[in-house]
């Protein structure tokens, strides 16, 4: 398990863009983390005031940050950054609303030099909310 302090040590993101609250499981190539979605999220002010829904792009960002925690926690990547290089086969299956807990899983399936490919999914109450294949570049 990695708490919020460990997450902040790995990631450069801060409020309001830090979208990982806790890491539940971590192994060499897979990480499972959570994001507790509350009505206090700043994006709910405009998306949508009468029907708040977490923007899909922010779900994907939360998945990317989850993968980033795994990659940037490795000694050889300390102090580096992870940048999006692409997204593929992204699907949104369930709306994420205030009160939901996103359970995010990212598994690295390919690495070549500074490029990494991750299969990622976000679930709410055991149901798939979003999934996709994310490509990252690791840099200084």
From Swiss-Prot:
Gene3D superfamilies assigned to the protein according to its UniProt record, in alphabetical order: Hotdog Thioesterase
Signal peptide interval: none
CDD domains (alphabetical): FabZ
Location(s) in or outside the cell: Cytoplasm
Pfam family, one: FabA
Gene Ontology process terms (BP): fatty acid biosynthetic process; lipid A biosynthetic process
EC number: 4.2.1.59
GO MF annotation terms: (3R)-hydroxyacyl-[acyl-carrier-protein] dehydratase activity
Residue numbers annotated as active site: 47
NCBIfam families: fabZ, PRK00006.1
Family, similarity comment: Belongs to the thioester dehydratase family. FabZ subfamily.
This protein's name: 3-hydroxyacyl-[acyl-carrier-protein] dehydratase FabZ
Organism: Streptococcus pneumoniae (strain ATCC BAA-255 / R6)
Taxonomic classification: Bacteria, Bacillati, Bacillota, Bacilli, Lactobacillales
